[in-house]
Amino acid sequence: MKKFKFASDFLWGTATAPTQIDGGDNASDWYEFCQQKGRILDGSSSFTGCDHWNRYKEDFDLMKKMGHNAYRLGADWSRFEPQPGSFDHKALDHFRQMLQYLKKKKIKPLLTLMHFAVPSWWLKKGGWTKEENIE
């Protein structure tokens, strides 16, 4: 059998979705969906996730310990713009700190800007289905 070797620049990593792991984002359509009785069989909620938003340093340390050099993460629009035109600068600064910690750990961030969840206010305006919403 011929020996196979990965390229030295191969990306080994982790991929996550913010709605599933971050916790604390109550301004998205998925949060509202989870609050509707009967939508989730056991009644659980995505609101807490696994608290990655607050425990990211521990998570990134574990990734590094496992030999990961890449992390595909998402940025939930609803966390950064919870109301139309109103940006949460504290959340933006926190996300910047997360990216800086990844850099410190020499883990390459691969950013997903749209991972299905949208702000509730956007959906109520008709979301992507209304031409006037798209600039």
Task: Tell me the role of every PLM-derived stretch.
Residues D22-D25, F60-E135:
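Substrate-binding cleft and catalytic face of glycoside hydrolase catalytic domains
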